[in-house]
């Protein structure tokens, strides 16, 4: 189930994105990217519709996934 990111409290959204970024451990190449920069990138992707927040009823978990998968 897709959860509209606009319906999530700002502090909760920030923590959700932070947990996602830290869990993913994405390699940004030779350039070091700050945690806040990574969080801002995910926020931009949410606003543009590139990614969505997804709740799994089966596993009772929340994740951020590429919107095209749905």
Curated annotation (Swiss-Prot):
Signal peptide extent: none
Cited InterPro entries: UPF0270, YehU-like_sf
NCBIfam families the UniProt entry points to: PRK04966.1 (NF003438)
Family: Belongs to the UPF0270 family.
Protein name: UPF0270 protein VS_2853
Organism taxonomic ancestry: Bacteria, Pseudomonadati, Pseudomonadota, Gammaproteobacteria, Vibrionales
């Amino acid at each position: 189930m897709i959860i509209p990111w606009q319906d999530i409290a700002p502090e909760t959204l920030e923590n959700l994105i932070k947990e996602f970024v830290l869990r993913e451990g994405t390699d940004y190449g030779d350039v070091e990217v700050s945690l806040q920069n990574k969080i801002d990138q995910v926020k931009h992707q949410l606003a543009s519709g590139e990614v969505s927040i997804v709740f799994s009823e089966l596993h009772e978990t929340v994740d951020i996934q590429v919107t095209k998968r749905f």
